[in-house]
């Protein structure tokens, strides 16, 4: 069953297109009654053998989490400035092992009550997109029971 509700999952990173997606959601929905936004950034945990020592991995994760929390706070402020009540904006930065970021985002979508997912389109060439696929293309192709907004 498709979910018709006013809960929006806004998957972000620090790219220009993610910033545009945040601005677009603010422009389109800010100030309207009842919309709830969850800002999501999945922290992709590197393979076990990526770091020489456990301490290096822990430091990297700590530094990266701090950077992402700052980014999510910035996006949250932007949405508040666009008219969203503070109480209706949630931030999430789960750590997951993600061979595919799109799959991890879709797993997060399943665990929420969001009827809409919003992503920024990656700036890939047609050749790169054909070879590797893009996160937004994979989300459009695999998302079920929700609306998908791709902001370019």
Please name every model-derived segment.
Residues 1, 109-152:
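Gly/Ser-rich helix-loop-strand patches that form or flank binding pockets
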Residues 2-58, 81-82:
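Small/aliphatic-rich secondary-structure junction motif
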Residues 38-40, 89-94, 149:
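General small-molecule cofactor/ligand-binding pocket signal
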